[in-house]
Curated annotation (Swiss-Prot):
Superkingdom of this protein's organism: Bacteria
Residues the UniProt record annotates as site (Transition state stabilizer): 17
Species lineage: Bacteria, Pseudomonadati, Pseudomonadota, Alphaproteobacteria, Hyphomicrobiales
Residues that hold ATP according to the record: 9-10, 17, 93-95, 103, 128-134
UniProt protein name: Phosphopantetheine adenylyltransferase
Originating species: Bartonella bacilliformis (strain ATCC 35685 / KC583 / Herrer 020/F12,63)
Record-listed E.C. numbers: 2.7.7.3
Localization (cell): Cytoplasm
Bilayer-spanning residue ranges: none
Functional pathway: Cofactor biosynthesis; coenzyme A biosynthesis; CoA from (R)-pantothenate: step 4/5
GO molecular function: ATP binding; pantetheine-phosphate adenylyltransferase activity
């Protein structure tokens, strides 16, 4: 069984992340979404809320269940967790040249430490290239419409978070 390992903060999951998940599901039998949990980093959504949002997206928009999409946490080196779960490859999304430069450096470092794990880059769709979780936070915090940038369940969760 091929297992794609897709790590990030997913705070919250965006349509750009959804693009990468769709592509990953085409390449692997199973995708493990690994949410990085760092005590010193303040998150808008709790780990449990992010798991629920991603699981709902998998079920409702991607039509996949826990046999194809699993959500876990990690707080160590990404490659260590990828090895622990038996990942076949790492998945990273690319929006622009800045992402490419950063992700190539990370892939190089990961490749030295874990040569058995290749990194597969998936380009964002044209509409997904402008989306960042940070911008989504800012728009939602000011009561703006984020429905173009996040799945419907996430837009609803943001409305509840920011009470608008």
């Amino acid at each position: 069984m091929t297992i794609a390992f897709y790590a990030g903060s997913f705070d919250p999951i965006t349509n750009g992340h959804l693009d990468v998940l769709r592509g990953s599901l085409l390449l692997a039998d199973k995708v493990v979404v690994a949410i990085g949990v760092q005590a010193q980093k303040q998150s808008l959504f709790s780990f449990e809320e992010r798991v629920d949002l991603i699981t709902q997206v998998g079920r409702d928009l991607l039509n996949v269940g826990p046999d194809r999409l699993q959500v876990i946490s990690f707080n160590n080196l990404l490659i260590d967790t990828a090895r622990e779960i038996g990942a076949s490859f790492l998945v990273r999304g690319l929006r622009d040249g800045t992402d490419f430069d950063y992700e190539m450096q990370m892939a190089g470092m990961n490749g030295i430490m874990a040569p058995e794990l290749q990194t597969v880059f998936l380009p964002a769709s044209i509409s997904g290239r402008v989306i960042t979780s940070t911008l989504v936070h800012q728009i939602a915090a000011m009561g703006g419409d984020v429905t173009h940038f996040v799945p419907q369940n996430v837009a609803q969760a943001l409305r509840l978070k920011f009470k608008f």
